Amino acid sequence: MFVDQVKINVKAGNGGNGMVAFRREKFVPNGGPAGGDGGRGGNVVFVVDEGLRTLMDFRYQRKFKAKSGGNGAIKSMTGRGAEDTIIKVPQGTTIMDAETDQVIGDLVAPDDSVIVAHGGRGGRGNIHFASPKNPAPEIAENGEPGEEREIRLELKVLADVGLVGFPSVGKSTLLSTVTSAKPKIAEYHFTTLVPNLGMVRLPDGRDFVMADLPGLIEGAANGVGLGFQFLRHVERTRVILHLIDMSGLEGRTPYDDFEKINQELQTYDPDILKRPQIVVANKMDMPDSAENLAQFKEDLKQDTLLAQTPEIFAVSALTHDGLTPLLQRTADMLAETPQFPVKQPEVATTAEYNFQPEAEFTLNQDADGTWILGGDKLVKLFKMTDVNHEESLLRFARQMRGMGVDDSLREHGAKNGDLVKIDDFTFEYMA
């Protein structure tokens, strides 16, 4: 099964916890703190595997979690850093943040890799909190939480040449004739349901990858037929071979086919029409094809969608007539055409500053009167607080006070004994 789009969840490893420990050695009185730091959590890394062809494996595993770092130890020993979690994807995979659609990475080269979620840093041991006022602190940090995010993977086949056209115009027949690929061929529309790839090898030693893309119909960019689910694969191609059935047996005129397919490509992404395009006038072995081709050349003069009039090659994929000059010209055109970069989502280039600091925490009250504290910064500070040591809790209380949490609770009417909740931790408010 060919799978080219999937949504998954990734979670990097948490940092290891710092340790509260003291140096206990013979003849060393008052040895002082000796708790080590936690190790860094593992990253989640995507790498290219040239042996993969689809994203099918992700249908069965949608959550990936890296290991956490090791905890700090006595004698100021740092915990072991966790190994990265490596996720293999096919060449040509684009990785995007599912929430913002921001491109995280575009893995097109065999050795490409990208970190999609960073592991948390290790928490500090009590050796970092010693001071003249508190030479033996019982304070240590928990590890920083690792990043977690929803990401979307899109596979865009890496082909130099893309075959586009209405269903049953002969794309699969052409691919099977000029390559060793064996796509399904039958006398009905939408025989091809997934992209098929083949390698074209010319006698002069040149070669290129050709992709047979499922047939488009009018309205495909808006979801009609197979919709635009395979139009994304055209984005990777450098040259487009636009196959047109010159026989007219489908009841459509060749120029109408040409115009409608290009309109669909323009609706999906206007930049696709900037790619070199060759018109492949197929089925020239049929009775009325020569007459239809002559009319098509006349009609083509009125085309306004393409920047320049495309070259036309009359062929018969069935009898192999005309294929050699078509492939030679395609190879020449590839040599003249650079790679097209992945299209990034448009973002604002001008930032507006209103000089209002971002809120460090949020405060709400639920139905039973419990005060709920939230906010990324505050929750992160709490998760890095070792609640098993009183001094760590007192330090967290000072941090909240410095952020203005106490003042905010008081202003909102909190009273002594009210319950306050942060994440999964509940305590009583003391004014």
Swiss-Prot record:
Protein name as catalogued: GTPase Obg
Keyword Hydrolase: yes
PANTHER family from the UniProt entry: DEVELOPMENTALLY REGULATED GTP-BINDING PROTEIN-RELATED, MITOCHONDRIAL RIBOSOME-ASSOCIATED GTPASE 2
Signal peptide limits: none
Species the sequence originates in: Levilactobacillus brevis (strain ATCC 367 / BCRC 12310 / CIP 105137 / JCM 1170 / LMG 11437 / NCIMB 947 / NCTC 947)
One GO MF term attached to the UniProt entry: magnesium ion binding
Domain OCT: 353-431
Function comment: An essential GTPase which binds GTP, GDP and possibly (p)ppGpp with moderate affinity, with high nucleotide exchange rates and a fairly low GTP hydrolysis rate. Plays a role in control of the cell cycle, stress response, ribosome biogenesis and in those bacteria that undergo differentiation, in morphogenesis control.
Residue positions binding Mg(2+): S172, T192
Gene of this entry: obg
Keywords linked to the UniProt accession: Cytoplasm, GTP-binding, Hydrolase, Magnesium, Metal-binding, Nucleotide-binding
SS bonds (residue pairs): none
Record carries keyword Cell cycle: no
Quaternary state and interactors: Monomer.
Pfam families for the chain: DUF1967, GTP1_OBG, MMR_HSR1
Subcellular location field: Cytoplasm
This protein's GO CC annotations: cytoplasm
